[in-house]
Amino acid sequence: MDEKYDAALDLLRRLNPNNLTENLQRIIGLEPELAEDLLSSIDVPLKVQQDSKQSGRPFLCCDYNRDVDSYRSPWSNEYFPELSAEDLQESPFPSESLRSLEVLANDSFDVYRDLYYEGGISSVYLWDLDEEGEFAGVVLFKKEGSNKESWDSIHVIEATKGNDDETFTYRLTSTIILALDNKQNDTSLAGNLTRQTEKEAKIDTSNTDISHITNLGTLIEDIESQLRTQLEIVYFEKTRDIFHQTRSQKSTTDSQEQQQKEVIKGLQNL
């Protein structure tokens, strides 16, 4: 089982990242027993669904807000498409207190999205952990452009109590999925970048919700800035260097071929 899982991951790393979703489904079709492990460990571009109970307001879909083939909206707290009454009884929902924090988080990160992304869609989903007051969740951002260009940010969070009631440890696993496509010269660039970080922070016990939003907002803002910088300075620059080197080698090869043709032509004229 482990060998098949490792082989699947290795194969996905070598295939075109633009076709990640399709390739993942094909592998699961071949080895269904790998489905749960692969879906929980492989981040794919986020889907968009509409909340018909909130005037068709869009929300983002991932494995964390999915139940059966439906997705829970952060706006109405209902599943779309609608689940049967039997399935709905078993469907996961946040507790009442955590739902209050989830609503505040969605409103807050919607403002963040508007300021930093100048468009796009954001969604936040939270779920309870075993210890009272602790929770986990995911913060999602998606911005699409023309020609299938897209930026997906997936931040999986875990908030657990520290040594005292006023301290929380926030663990964050962030993934950026980027796709760029230039139709004019048939050039595309796609891939993903994942980083983990952890931070301890104080909370105001008289207003824990605001404290959690402030701490998570600061943490996500910092990691997104770092990832953007890393993509721009490290990965884009390295890709450009490889591209220029390839073009330079091709020019050198073309020049050598021309010189060889001239030598052969000269010998033929002797």
Swiss-Prot record:
Chief location of this protein within or outside the cell: cytoplasm
Subunit annotation: Component of the F-actin capping complex, composed of a heterodimer of an alpha and a beta subunit.
Keyword Cytoplasm: yes
Function: F-actin-capping proteins bind in a Ca(2+)-independent manner to the fast growing ends of actin filaments (barbed end) thereby blocking the exchange of subunits at these ends. Unlike other capping proteins (such as gelsolin and severin), these proteins do not sever actin filaments.
Any one Gene Ontology molecular-function term assigned to this protein's record: actin filament binding
Source organism superkingdom: Eukaryota
Organism: Candida glabrata (strain ATCC 2001 / BCRC 20586 / JCM 3761 / NBRC 0622 / NRRL Y-65 / CBS 138)
Subcellular location field: Cytoplasm, Cytoskeleton, Actin patch; Cytoplasm, Cytoskeleton
Alphabetical UniProt keywords: Actin capping, Actin-binding, Cytoplasm, Cytoskeleton
Protein name in UniProt: F-actin-capping protein subunit beta
GO cellular component, one term: actin body
Transmembrane segments: none
